[in-house]
């Protein structure tokens, strides 16, 4: 019997939706995007109106083949990726691959069976079933907006990154939004470095009234005019003038102040509060929210989507959800906390789709306490945050009684020194009973001036207990943390909240910034971050301009609304980009060849030192060094690092000079492959080093995937060789997920070839049956037979001259004694013979590799021209 084929992005989402749709549908997962611009090559024809060359993403061929197979027997195809630009693009690519032919997939007239788009903002039975009653066509304005963003990012990534490779260092990347975000951090650091602190003083008077409590009032002016205390001399003069002064209440102002609840979460507000309140990175918070949206097992209820879609700019709330939350407030908190009408909020974002809702619980009746047993710790924290914010948004305002008291101290010659104190008392909790929005430190500056006050009246005399002068210094603007960076990006209109997690991860992973340890860790630009930012901003002024980047974001919104053509937006961008790119190619400084004169002398020969650039940053070298002259001076030394660049890194217990614990010589800061560290100046005689824990270790991220060995959840972890996936049950369970490339081992025939990382950081390929099978290859094996020596496989080697297929039996770089050894047949023990006989049937189906003397085959074939594979950022 034919069924409807439903395609979503993830297996977790598929599992939840399958339960709601029943046996009449097959729900399958595409595992995210199935098509993209080619990994190598630009993939965009800028001369032909930005025509694109999309291809199936390598590794997704089996997924696409399986979906095609299922589509052939389905009576209808329902495309149900997420309700946003990315989801619409996934749906469009699925439609193209599953048989829609006319207009590049933009209509389905030649498709014999209906191909329909289905969207829902929450994964609940009611929402899903209702969505399937009202399917629609693909929204090509949304697809065009996504494609425009993708092309913009590809153009910048592929054409600017090579400039950095050529002028600074290979492996660096530039991104249309990534670089602008980095610019914010770098410019803030420059602002901090330029900041000159200014001295100022405060003066508080501790006073008694007829009744307690004692309170403090602060000096604000003289004879009714505002005045500041600039130094200690002025402070002491005021203290002398106030000796014997009469203290009187000049005025008392009382007012009732209301504090309104905040709207339910948008994506950016959620990211900020998760960072401030929960100490979560933006990336982690979004991953946890994704799991809550796609579905969590709730015992007998089965899999349930607990929150609405978490990528939204809207604060709208549906009528059913409003009815439900008002019912809960009246029942659990009382009618006094329930407004007569629902609170209505206006969306600030210009292009927020009102079809979307704010982030809220799918059912507010599922309280955090009721679901706590089924959630992981971070899931519960995020769910509770969203639940509390939503409930509070529909409650009454909090009410405060605020009293402001002006006090005069009448001194000699009737000079009146003015003091002020503000008292604030919570009269009615309102929404604060459930939730209070987190604030930046600067938002709380005035809180210290609010006190509980005794009964006071104008004309009342007061008694002075003491005067408390205190010295202060103005402070520079604070460095960005994740929450404040997200806030700044949103306020400037740079990027979209859904991309902020990727942007932040990229600038950290590329080594452009470091993040100090602990909750609310601050971003500090590294030396390479400063260099890259200054080069790009100086030479590509338009492209990495704040206003231009924000304007391009507005253009993308207009493409989505159908107000402008996507190609027009690209032409506007590319006109400026092409000019800037040409200018940068001619005028960008080549840091690799930099030799800046300094006033320092060589410690070996006395010649002047010059500042040069190496793979680990800048360093000093003797100006007489000559590569061609083996007798020239080779003296070099580290460029001392400004300690402020390391922020909160612990240099030593008192930030004074540190000495080696082994030899007593001074320790200095150095840079290496893995970052900044302390090293003894007695090197090479003394090799003492000490790590700096200035960078926060990335937290383990739970994945929606089970361990095949023990059934526990898998975790995305970070080790010394990069990210890897392993079991959360470690050390009891030592399962590590291997990176299969989809090829059987050509040596043993039973194992799979996996990509591995060596201690030195380079990749190689080996059999996953190691140590039973010791097959390895220095380059990626390909399931092709060598036409010359009939080797069972070839290898794909990428060089600066292009991509080549080479025979493993040819003498190639990286294949020395070890490579020869791997080709030798192993000696058979009795146990191995026995094992082999048991697997004979399985092995017969796999052709045995043809083993010939290494170096005896010369087969090589060029299959691709050299391409710059820039490390672009999807912004």
Q: What is each model feature region?
A:
Residues 16-20, 66, 89-97, 127-134, ...:
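Alpha-helical scaffold elements adjacent to nucleotide-binding pockets in ATP/GTP-utilizing enzyme cores
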Residues 123-205, 255:
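C-terminal or mid-to-C-terminal helical accessory/interaction module adjacent to the motor/catalytic core
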Residues 1-150, 220-221, 229, 236, ...:
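Intrinsically disordered, low-complexity regulatory segments
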Residues 228-263, 460:
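Metal- or metallocofactor-binding catalytic centers and their adjacent structured scaffolds
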Residues 252, 261-274, 301-309, 476-488:
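Short acidic, hydrophobic short linear motifs in intrinsically disordered regions
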Residues 2-5, 16, 161, 194, ...:
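Basic, low-complexity terminal or inter-domain segments flanking catalytic cores
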Residues 2, 82-84, 169-173, 254-263, ...:
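Conserved short loop/turn motifs at secondary-structure junctions
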Residues 148-159, 177, 207-209, 257-269, ...:
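Core structural elements
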């Amino acid at each position: 019997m034919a069924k409807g084929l439903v395609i979503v992005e993830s297996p977790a989402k598929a599992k939840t939706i399958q339960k709601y749709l029943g046996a009449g549908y097959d729900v399958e997962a595409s595992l995210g995007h199935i098509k993209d611009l080619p990994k190598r090559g630009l993939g965009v024809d800028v001369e032909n109106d930005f025509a694109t060359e999309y291809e199936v993403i390598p590794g997704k061929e089996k997924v696409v083949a399986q979906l095609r197979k299922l589509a052939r027997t389905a009576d209808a195809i329902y495309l149900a990726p997420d309700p946003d630009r990315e989801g619409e693009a996934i749906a469009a690519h699925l439609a193209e691959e599953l048989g829609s032919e006319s207009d590049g997939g933009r209509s389905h007239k030649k498709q014999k069976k209906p191909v329909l788009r289905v969207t829902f903002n929450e994964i609940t039975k009611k929402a899903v079933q209702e969505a399937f009653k009202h399917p629609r066509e693909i929204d090509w304005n949304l697809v065009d907006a996504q494609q425009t963003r993708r092309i913009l990012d590809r153009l910048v990534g592929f054409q600017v990154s090579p400039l950095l490779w050529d002028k600074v260092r290979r492996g660096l990347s530039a991104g249309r939004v990534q670089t602008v975000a980095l610019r914010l951090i770098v410019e803030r650091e420059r602002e901090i470095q330029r900041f000159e602190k200014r001295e100022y003083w405060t003066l508080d008077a501790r006073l008694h009234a007829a009744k307690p409590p004692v309170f403090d009032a602060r000096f604000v002016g003289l004879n009714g005019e505002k005045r500041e205390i600039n130094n200690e001399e002025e402070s002491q003069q005021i203290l002398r003038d106030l000796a014997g002064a009469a203290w009187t209440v000049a005025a008392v102002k009382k007012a009732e102040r209301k504090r309104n609840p905040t709207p339910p979460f948008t994506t950016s507000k959620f990211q900020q509060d998760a960072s401030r309140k929960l100490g979560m990175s933006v990336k982690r918070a979004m991953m946890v929210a994704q799991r809550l949206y796609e579905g969590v097992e709730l015992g007998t209820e089965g899999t349930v989507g607990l929150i609405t879609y978490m990528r939204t700019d809207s604060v709208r709330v549906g009528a059913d959800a409003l009815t439900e939350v008002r019912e809960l407030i009246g029942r659990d908190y009382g009618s006094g906390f329930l407004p007569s009408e629902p609170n209505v909020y206006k969306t600030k974002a210009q292009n927020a789709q009102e079809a979307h809702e704010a982030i809220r619980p799918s059912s507010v009746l599922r309280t955090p306490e009721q679901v706590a047993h089924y959630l992981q710790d971070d899931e519960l924290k995020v769910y509770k945050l969203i639940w509390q914010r939503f409930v509070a948004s529909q409650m009454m305002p909090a009410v405060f009684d605020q009293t402001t008291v002006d006090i005069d101290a009448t001194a000699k010659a009737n000079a009146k020194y003015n003091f002020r104190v503000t008292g604030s008392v919570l009269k009615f909790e309102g929404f604060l009973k459930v939730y209070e929005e987190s604030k930046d430190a600067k938002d709380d500056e005035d809180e210290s001036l609010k006190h509980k006050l005794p009964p006071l009246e104008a004309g009342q005399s007061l008694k002075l207990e003491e005067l408390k002068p205190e010295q202060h210094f103005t402070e520079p603007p604070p460095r960005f943390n994740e929450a404040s960076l997200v806030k700044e990006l949103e306020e400037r209109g740079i990027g979209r909240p859904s991309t902020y997690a990727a942007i932040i991860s990229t600038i950290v992973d590329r080594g452009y910034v470091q993040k100090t340890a602990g909750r609310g860790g601050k971003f500090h630009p590294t030396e390479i971050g400063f260099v890259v930012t200054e080069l790009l901003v100086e030479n590509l002024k338009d492209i990495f301009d704040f206003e231009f980047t924000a304007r391009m974001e507005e253009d993308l919104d207009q493409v989505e609304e159908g107000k402008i053509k996507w190609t027009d937006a690209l032409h506007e961008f590319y006109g400026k980009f092409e000019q800037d790119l040409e200018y940068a190619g001619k005028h960008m400084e080549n840091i690799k060849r930099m030799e800046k004169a300094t006033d320092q002398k060589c410690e070996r020969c006395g010649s002047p030192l010059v500042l040069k650039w190496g793979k680990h940053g800048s360093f000093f070298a003797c100006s007489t060094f000559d590569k061609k002259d083996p007798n020239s001076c080779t003296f070099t030394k580290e460029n001392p690092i400004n300690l402020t660049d390391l922020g909160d890194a612990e240099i030593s217990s008192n930030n004074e000079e540190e000495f080696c614990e082994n030899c007593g010589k001074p320790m200095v800061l150095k840079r290496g492959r893995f970052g900044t560290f302390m090293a003894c100046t007695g090197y090479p005689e003394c090799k003492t080093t000490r790590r700096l824990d200035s960078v926060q270790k990335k937290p383990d991220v739970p994945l929606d995937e089970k361990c095949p060995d023990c059934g526990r959840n898998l975790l995305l972890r970070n080790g010394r060789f990069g990210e890897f996936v392993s079991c959360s049950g470690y050390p009891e369970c030592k399962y590590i997920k291997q990176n299969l490339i989809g090829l059987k081992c050509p040596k043993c025939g039973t194992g799979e070839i996996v990509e591995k990382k060596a201690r030195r950081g380079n990749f190689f390929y080996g059999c996953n049956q190691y140590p039973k099978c010791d097959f390895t290859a220095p380059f990626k094996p390909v399931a092709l037979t060598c036409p010359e020596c009939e080797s069972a496989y070839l290898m794909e080697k990428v060089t600066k001259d292009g991509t080549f297929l080479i025979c493993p039996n040819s003498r190639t770089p990286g294949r020395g004694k070890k490579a020869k050894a791997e080709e030798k047949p192993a000696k058979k023990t009795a146990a191995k013979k026995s094992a082999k006989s048991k697997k004979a049937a399985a092995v017969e189906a796999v052709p045995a590799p043809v083993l010939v003397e290494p170096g005896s085959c010369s087969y090589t074939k060029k299959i691709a021209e050299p391409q710059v594979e820039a490390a672009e950022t999807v912004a």
